[in-house]
Design a protein with these regions (language model features):
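N-terminal glycine-rich phosphate-binding loop and ensuing alpha1 helix
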Residues: 1-62, 75, 82, 116-120
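A secondary-structure boundary/capping signal
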Residues: 8, 106-107, 183
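Short glycine/proline-enriched turns and hinge-like loops at secondary-structure junctions
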Residues: 17-19, 144-146, 173-174
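Conserved hydrophobic/aromatic positions in well-ordered beta-strands
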Residues: 25, 149-152, 180
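Alpha-helical scaffold segments in soluble metabolic enzymes
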Residues: 36, 40, 93, 185-189
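Conserved beta-loop-beta/alpha segment of the NTase-like Rossmann-fold superfamily
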Residues: 62-63, 67-155
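Catalytic-core segments of class I nucleotidyltransferases/pyrophosphorylases
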Residues: 103, 117-120, 124, 154-196
Length: 196
């Protein structure tokens, strides 16, 4: 089964005021932020995983940086449609490249899995059961939730409500999403939920 991974990377990064795209901010000598997304799939190749990177016209350094993966993965670059806003607009701009099984990872969000877990397997198995699935991190700090895609997850582990960067009701939420997966046929249901 092939997994298509979308990396929304079209933001201007104005808050950090870096002279280069924030996605290539160094974490250590070997890795930048965006490498975290590729490292989840180090045991896979182009037959199992392909990438879509949504960019703007100022991301040429990012394209050059990701060339190091060209021998291992198919990577498509697409410009964010200027009529589409925020991260959901970046994701919608990649729709024409989606596969049947898709995963959205935010390149500037560091995510770690439980020991022994494999992201490819988690996502492909989840999408066999449901057409839309979040990978979440429990969070009680309301100041953190105000900066994230906040979720209310019930006791059964189901996402009941979502709000992007809540200002008034942050205390209601108990988690935020780190990634989400969807089947192509469920995309508009998924994105409408996230844009409401």
């Amino acid at each position: 089964m092939k997994l298509t991974v979308t990396l929304p990377s079209a933001g201007k990064g104005t808050r950090l005021n870096l002279p280069y795209p924030k996605e290539i901010l160094r974490l250590d000598n070997d890795n930048a932020l965006i490498d975290n997304c590729f490292n989840f799939f180090k045991d896979y190749g182009r037959n199992q995983v392909e990438f879509i990177v949504v960019i703007n016209e100022d991301k040429t350094d990012l394209i050059k940086y990701l060339a190091k993966y060209k021998d291992r993965y198919n990577i498509s670059f697409v410009f964010q449609n200027p009529n589409e806003k925020e991260y959901t607009g970046a994701i919608k701009s990649a729709y024409h490249l989606f596969g049947e099984h898709n995963l959205v990872l935010l390149p500037d969000t560091l995510m770690r899995l439980q020991p022994g877990k494999d992201l490819y397997t988690l996502v492909t198995e989840a999408l066999e059961e449901t057409g839309f699935s979040f990978l979440v991190k429990k969070e009680e700090n309301k100041e953190v939730l105000k900066t994230k895609g906040a979720l209310y997850v019930n006791n059964e582990g189901n996402v009941v409500e979502y709000e992007d960067k809540p200002t008034d009701r942050a205390e209601y939420y108990n988690a935020f999403w780190c990634a989400f997966a969807f089947r192509r046929r469920n995309f508009y249901e998924c994105i409408n939920f996230m844009e409401k």
